[in-house]
Regions:
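Glycan-processing catalytic domains of CAZymes
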Residues: 2-532, 536-540, 550, 558-560, ...
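A glycine-rich, often tryptophan-bearing local segment used as a flexible ligand/cofactor-contacting loop or short
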Residues: 533-615
Length: 618
């Protein structure tokens, strides 16, 4: 039921109009739950954050998904062990000094319900004060911390220079619960998140997991949401700027004193606050990383696998399957780094708005691939727009998202789809219920096509070239509405439904000979970004390999500022291949070739266009 099925089973389900669908059930709405399970052809019923399933539902003959967030819902233990909450480095905004002294309030700019200063002796060893005018670290003797006021006072500094304080803070409200709480106007206790980096936390969680398995005999699949560390989401104190920083792929929320200490022992050098804060910019996934970031990511991945495997093995020992949600606390799981199979997961679930996210799920080596469709059954959607409430149109939302996702499903097989949220909200939207019935039937039909054979592909083999390579296959850092400003996400979305083989390669891959298996290379992004490549283009071996490959028949496609880096005869290092370069000001007095622009028929679809760029020349 929850694993892979043979063709006959799929055909039988297709004929009966059921299977491959996960329905969010809700205690108190048993009749509705079973009615919609029949209408949508569900074979599995799940709970959601804030809902439970009654015995009537769990004993109705369906598979049961139970959702657990392993690091939250432990408030009783967390209150007794507040030194074992998860942490992060925060950095105050730059503040200009008017004299040789300055006092900076640490929490003035941050959401007090999300963070609390960690001012333990071990934590203070990692705090740093910087002169941001010179970007020089201030000696510890020149600043002091006032515990009662939550502030740092500087002395002997330079007037009218800017200063920041980087400090460790406990995260006292789990971010996804915080979002759901504020979005749905819940009135209940804030959930804290505990850090399994501590041996005491590990012992507690293993005991909790054992008890949970024993007290949930009807559960067939345990859905981990997800592992231990959430993507970064820092809220501000002002409602006018609540979302200070969010990055789906960043590792800032994995920091703790014991993690920093263990890293130093294992890698032989000490990570500092500035290694994370990075002049206040943090290490955005959209920018190239460095060796220290790579080491930290590998270090966290080692830990998440080692302790995560213990929990998964326990779930398996009770005869249950273990699926993981590829969102929320996914950091450190890294399904595309070549080690994902070490977890032992039976399935992967990805929430999707777009085709590229369906391909992101389908490309992971795991027995079962499942998509969680939007819109979620919430009163409001992401961004606060009304959904299942007055003024909302969830049917239109569902059509928009399904149209984006469906084309990708024709290219790569997905085993299951489903919804999440509060089922009772659909009662006022019968057209939505009818449309999801159609979606479920379409999905089962598409799935049956894959059982008949591989989809048709043309011979062209496409490679998307950027800093992260295969580690960030298909995605950049989050959903489309979070990354739409980047050219590459539009390209990924287009590729997700095209009949071509697609791979994602790094600059090192090029130097190691991967181009022999590629017909087209796409490099797309703003200069200096991870997607264009930044300083990677200073490598003559890279430029030579690509030039030779094009000479032998390869096709190099550049978008926006491909191969851009300063310091050479051309701004685009591949200008000799592209036939075009960008003038950054150095060629303002030079002559230019005259050319005419034309729109070739059938090259650009009706209604679409290509944005013109200034300062480009032949």
């Amino acid at each position: 039921m929850t694993g892979m099925k043979n063709k006959q089973e799929y055909e039988e389900e297709l004929e009966m109009g059921k299977g491959g669908f996960t329905l969010p059930g809700e205690s108190g709405y048993e009749e509705l739950t079973l009615k919609m399970a029949e209408k949508w052809g569900a074979d599995v019923i799940r709970d959601s954050d804030g809902t439970v399933l009654s015995d009537e539902i769990t004993h109705a003959g369906y598979g049961i998904y139970s959702t657990i967030c392993i690091i939250r819902d432990h408030n009783a233990w967390a209150k007794e062990n507040q030194d074992k909450l998860q942490q992060t480095f925060l950095c105050t905004p730059p503040q200009a000094a008017e004299s040789d002294t300055l006092t900076i309030g640490l929490m003035d700019s941050f959401f007090a319900e999300q963070f609390r200063i960690n001012d333990s002796a071990e934590s203070l060893e990692y705090w740093e004060v910087y002169d941001r005018t010179t970007n020089v670290k201030i000696d510890n003797a020149d600043w002091s911390y006032d515990k009662e006021k939550g502030s740092v006072s500087l002395s002997g500094i330079i007037p009218f220079h800017k200063y920041t304080v980087s400090f460790l803070a406990y995260r006292i409200w789990e971010e996804i619960s915080m979002y759901n709480h504020t979005t749905n106007h819940w009135d209940k206790e804030h959930l804290m998140q505990i850090d399994p980096r501590y041996p005491e936390t590990q012992e507690y969680l293993l005991g909790w997991m054992k008890h949970w398995c024993e007290t949930h005999p009807d559960t067939t699949v345990v859905r981990f949401t997800s592992m231990f560390y959430n993507f970064v989401w820092i809220w501000g104190s002002s409602e006018r700027n609540r979302n200070l920083f969010s990055d789906w792929g960043s590792y800032d929320f994995t920091v703790s004193v014991p993690a920093l200490q263990e890293f130093e022992k294992q890698y032989g050098y000490r990570m500092t606050a500035e290694d994370f804060i990075n002049k206040g910019q943090l290490h955005v996934t959209h920018m190239p990383g460095n060796a220290k970031k790579a080491d930290w990511m590998a270090f966290i991945n080692d830990f998440v696998i080692s302790f995560g495997r213990k929990l998964i093995d326990m779930v398996h020992s009770y005869g249950k399957k273990a699926y993981v949600f590829y969102d929320d606390s996914w950091v450190g799981v890294e399904p595309y780094n070549g080690r994902f199979q070490e977890f032992g997961f039976d399935g992967l679930i990805k929430c999707v708005f777009s085709g590229y996210e369906a391909r992101l799920c389908a490309g992971v080596d795991v027995p079962t691939h499942e998509l969680r469709l939007h819109p979620y059954l919430f009163p409001v959607g992401l961004g606060g727009a009304p959904t299942f409430m007055e003024g909302g149109n969830p049917t239109l939302d569902a059509k928009k998202y399904w149209n984006s996702v469906r084309r990708a499903l024709l290219r790569a097989k997905i085993d299951r789809i489903g919804l999440g949220g509060y089922l009772h909200l659909v009662e006022g939207f019968p057209d939505f219920c009818d449309y999801i019935e159609k979606v479920a039937d379409e999905f089962r039909l598409i799935r049956s096509f894959h059982d008949a054979g591989e989809p048709y592909r043309i011979k062209t083999r496409v490679a998307v070239l950027h800093y992260w390579g295969s580690l960030r296959s298909w995605t950049l850092s989050g959903h489309f509405h979070e990354t739409y400003m980047h050219d590459l996400i539009h390209i990924n979305e287009a590729l997700s439904g095209l009949p071509v083989d697609v791979k994602f390669i790094s600059f090192e891959d090029v130097k190691n000979g991967i181009l022999k298996d590629v017909d087209v290379v796409i490099n797309a992004g703003r200069a200096g970004s991870a997607w264009s490549g930044g300083d990677a283009w200073k490598d003559e071996e890279l430029v030579t390999a690509l030039t030779k490959w094009v000479h032998e028949g390869g096709c190099f496609i550049g978008v926006n500022e491909p191969s851009a880096v300063e310091g050479y005869d051309t701004y685009f290092r591949m200008a000799h291949v592209l036939g075009i370069d960008e003038d950054t000001g150095a060629r303002v007095c030079h002559g230019r070739w005259i050319f005419e622009t034309a729109d070739p028929e059938h090259l650009i679809p009706e209604g679409a266009g290509v944005e013109a760029k200034e300062n480009r020349y032949l």
